[in-house]
Amino acid sequence: MVFKLLEQAGIKIDLDDEPKKVQTAPQFDDDDENEIRIVIVGVGGSGNNTITRLYDLGVQGAELIAMNTDAQALKHAKAHKKLLLGKDLTQGKGSGGDPEVGYRAAEASAHEIAETIGDADLVFITAGMGNGTGTGAAPVVARVIKERARHNGRFREPLVISVVTYPFKNEGKIREEKAKAGIKALLYYSDTVVIIENDKLLQLVPKLPINAAFRFADEIIARMVKGITETIKLPSMVNIDFADVYSIMHNGGAALIGIGESDSSNRAVDAVKNALQNKLLDVEYGSGEKALVHFTVGPDVSLGEINEAMNIVYEKLGEKSEIKWGARIDEDMGKMVRAMVIMTGVKSPHILGGETALQLPVKESLLPAEPKAGFNSFEDKIYKVISRKSDEKPGSDMRGYINKLLADFDDLS
């Protein structure tokens, strides 16, 4: 079902952890000013792992950027560009698992973040939720991208798609609550936040050791981002253009990804059925408003097979759903068909009841030329969602807590 993806991740079926040889990524080249510019940013340890995997895979048509508060981890990451966040604050020693440190470090580096990313049309942000740098810094990165575009008078703001992992239950309640708040903070400034629930991932491959499971999560994110990027940028069996992706993902709120593979006699249909069954987030179908479906296929797959598979998607999601799809040929797939379904506008308990009403419009603000001091700005109030005071119990009513914070917004406009 997903064994080909495991193989491509360098995870053997016998659970041998020896990685397979990977290809080297070409240098990023973006000389054509009329080209859609795509940037992929990995924030924190988990995000850096995804960027490294994308670099090894050789994703074409996108610039890869790694950001971290840990200088040693950043040194080992593979990317076209790297940025150490909050150098004067953390001295390159990391966040210690504290989202507030990640947030402060990103705030102190806001100008550098803007300059490193530059002007882009589509930005993917990858991070792990529940720890320090990814949880605290990723929302700041998303905000800076939007603010730079507004500050520069861009007619259309960049499309920001965040792709994050949600921790295992056995990682503890504290980390889970940090992750929920981090996702909610990301929703303020991302158009769409794709959430991959680690426990759901483990259900697909229950016998994997924990380190291989994390690598599998990196592979899913990397393949998803690579697939969308190259289907936009390169000639494909069926292209998805940037306008299609923008239509589905703009103001999409929270999103899930489902993944499936098959080499059966009815492989495309079975791959889609598996993808719809293998949801990597706890949601009910029917709650999503829009969907993006991407197929990775071998050279002998026909368009008729793909069309038949898409009929399953239309039947499952309903006539009123807006659905875009594309397909790319990958010689390594052989007889296998892989389907990835991204559904936006979903409701999940991991985003505080699943409501997207708190996805606020970006406030006008100039990019800081110097690090901010104190905690009095609009962004600092938003950050209180991430960094909750120690006297608040993890099981407290976070919904009420956020609403109380949002009550201050009117005073800031």
UniProtKB/Swiss-Prot annotation:
Keywords: Cell cycle, Cell division, Cytoplasm, GTP-binding, Nucleotide-binding, Septation. Disulfide bonds: none annotated. Belongs to the FtsZ family. GTP binds at G132, T133, G134, E171, R175, D218. Pfam families: FtsZ_C (PF12327), Tubulin (PF00091). InterPro entries: Cell_div_FtsZ (IPR000158), Cell_div_FtsZ_CS (IPR020805), FtsZ/CetZ (IPR045061), FtsZ_C (IPR024757), Tub_FtsZ_C (IPR008280), Tubulin/FtsZ_2-layer-sand-dom (IPR018316), Tubulin/FtsZ_GTPase_sf (IPR036525), Tubulin_FtsZ_GTPase (IPR003008). The keyword Phosphoprotein does not apply. CDD domains: FtsZ_type1 (cd02201). HAMAP family: FtsZ. This is Cell division protein FtsZ 2. Essential cell division protein that forms a contractile ring structure (Z ring) at the future cell division site. The regulation of the ring assembly controls the timing and the location of cell division. One of the functions of the FtsZ ring is to recruit other cell division proteins to the septum to produce a new cell wall between the dividing cells. Binds GTP and shows GTPase activity.
